[in-house]
Amino acid sequence: MTTVLQRREQLNLWEQFCSWVTSTNNRLYVGWFGVLMIPTLLAATICFVIAFIAAPPVDIDGIREPVSGSLLYGNNIITGAVVPSSNAIGLHFYPIWEAASLDEWLYNGGPYQLIIFHFLIGVFCYMGREWELSYRLGMRPWICVAYSAPVAAATAVFLIYPIGQGSFSDGMPLGISGTFNFMLVFQAEHNILMHPFHQLGVAGVFGGALFSAMHGSLVTSSLIRETTETESANYGYKFGQEEETYNIVAAHGYFGRLIFQYASFNNSRALHFFLAAWPVIGIWFTALGISTMAFNLNGFNFNHSVVDAQGNVINTWADIINRANLGMEVMHERNAHNFPLDLASAESAPVAMIAPSING
């Protein structure tokens, strides 16, 4: 009897790389989306940290009046931000090689574009990586669908809104106070608080927080005790156990009696779908609202006040909102224009009925 021994063919380097990338045995799954996600998020993070600490002032309005955003130029953690690229650049793609010098690139806010483009590519790839890992493990794909809500929101404020407004200088600054400034100006120019899609987003976020707290407290209150009174109930759970860890019938009975019977879920799968779908759909609507307001399809306005039979204005909350919007619009970009667009385009109002007499 003859035994033939053959040497096992060694995998070439590319096949080893493919096997490593798609392996679900790694401590952290890489995946093909991860191959692009890792360098883009690293580039965005490194540039953000450097710019937040040391970037020179940026001519955001394109009128040769730079705005400081970094820590080394007088800001703190609250006021600091990566300032959006200049209005003089508009929507032009502005990588480093398009500038005459590095100083010019920094002056025109080039780091902002570098950060948001790499960041958006990175979070898109993170979403794809979630789908890829679910596929490898034989799971359903709804994790990446849920993650699409914050991805849509980030895309709306960093990409869609600047495109609609015609300049990346209108994008959201990368900082705490800059975010608040963006919100105030957005309200002033688009009346977002009166937009139904934003209202759905508020209901989604606050409702999701409420439902999450209700669910967590109900589960915690109806745990099946596997321990003695002197031990924590948490020690009664073993990872991977087949038994239920809480009594859904007890939780259903409690909540049904607290409100009414049909307010409580008796199906755990339907319950958890609802907990996921409510905030996701709400945030989808908010992102859609931002994307429509980007092209000036704004929230409801009540610019025509309610008047009585004699023509006297009956003040409502709408008048207060209008006045607040005008005030915020006057304050922002104070040197780029003298009046907000609403005032500059309206009919001139007389400020004096009779010419004053001058005693010379």
UniProtKB/Swiss-Prot annotation:
A quinone binds at residues 215, 264-265. Residues 345-360 form a propeptide. GO terms for molecular function: chlorophyll binding; electron transporter, transferring electrons within the cyclic electron transport pathway of photosynthesis activity; iron ion binding; oxidoreductase activity, acting on diphenols and related substances as donors, oxygen as acceptor; oxygen evolving activity. Coiled coil: none annotated. InterPro entries: D1/D2, Photo_II_D1/D2_sf, Photo_RC_L/M, Photo_RC_L/M_CS, PSII_D1. Pheophytin a binds at residue 126. The D1/D2 heterodimer binds P680, chlorophylls that are the primary electron donor of PSII, and subsequent electron acceptors. It shares a non-heme iron and each subunit binds pheophytin, quinone, additional chlorophylls, carotenoids and lipids. D1 provides most of the ligands for the Mn4-Ca-O5 cluster of the oxygen-evolving complex (OEC). There is also a Cl(-1) ion associated with D1 and D2, which is required for oxygen evolution. The PSII complex binds additional chlorophylls, carotenoids and specific lipids. PSII is composed of 1 copy each of membrane proteins PsbA, PsbB, PsbC, PsbD, PsbE, PsbF, PsbH, PsbI, PsbJ, PsbK, PsbL, PsbM, PsbT, PsbX, PsbY, PsbZ, Psb30/Ycf12, peripheral proteins PsbO, CyanoQ (PsbQ), PsbU, PsbV and a large number of cofactors. It forms dimeric complexes. Precursor protein interacts with Ycf48. Belongs to the reaction center PufL/M/PsbA/D family. Cyanobacteria usually contain more than 2 copies of the psbA gene. 2 of the reaction center chlorophylls (ChlD1 and ChlD2) are entirely coordinated by water. This is Photosystem II protein D1 3. The gene is psbA3.
